[in-house]
Amino acid sequence: MSETYRHFFVKALYDMRESVILGMDQRRKPQEKEGTKQMKFDMHCHTKEGSMDGKVPIDDFIAELIRKGFNGMLVSDHNSYNGYRTWKRNIKDQKFKDFVVLKGIEYDTIDAGHILVIMPETIKLKILELRGLPVQILIDIVHKNGGILGPAHPCGEKYLSFTNTLKKRNQMAVMNQFDFLEGFNACESVESNHCAKVLAEMYALPAFGGSDAHKTDCVGMAYTDIPEQIHCESDLIRAVKLGEGIKCGGSYYRGTTK
């Protein structure tokens, strides 16, 4: 997408955000909760054990997030749960007992870029580790099994992001089926994140913040504040469906790669 086209695309999104004529899903807008302690998560984390391009072992990832004041993380390796498995088999109940590690995945669809998926802790689906499903089939599988999903870096690079991969005529119908989206990614541009936040407003979706870290110096550069006590995947799913008071933000990673 050229810079000129991207500029007009973002402006058009902004201008349309309050539109009802286009038939957008006008779900209840999130309201901020009072009197509840926020939990701070990095919602986009790649580990050495689970991602081929990941450089940070999961125990080092956790230690760095704790040092930066985080309460938890969503492990979201590329088409793999191996990072989470390493934590569950070798680290859980031995170290970092007050830190919440949630099981997620960054799934590579054939037609809509990368999608973040979170399933209830009781559900195990091997198909989610086999990349290449069409996004509509992925949505159906996830929702039928009680999970939630949303696009990672939705306005990012071609073939990796939703708005620059899925055919434009199909985007609205699919957006209305997502449960959240990534509103701030530390490895994306200012423009890309602005576009993502406009989409979140248009479709009244909770917006996650995630570092998308593959290296130590990127860990924890983005955050998601959740006004709920989150101890497992089902807690997160419930909080996202409630949609109240979830906030995101962060800083920009200036390294040449993630």
Regions found by a protein language model. Give the residues of each.
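Short beta-strand/loop segments at the ligand-binding rim of alpha/beta enzyme cores
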Residues: 145-150, 154-155
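Acidic, metal/ion-coordinating pockets
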Residues: 79
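Loop/turn elements at helix/coil->beta-strand transitions in domains of secreted/extracellular proteins
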Residues: 71, 99, 146-148
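Charged catalytic cores and adjacent phosphate/nucleic-acid-binding surfaces used
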Residues: 5-64, 70, 82-91, 96, ...
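Conserved beta-strand positions in the central sheet of alpha/beta enzyme cores
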Residues: 74-75, 150-151, 182
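Glycine-rich anion/phosphate-binding loops
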Residues: 129-132
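N-terminal amphipathic/hydrophobic targeting modules at extreme N-termini
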Residues: 1-2
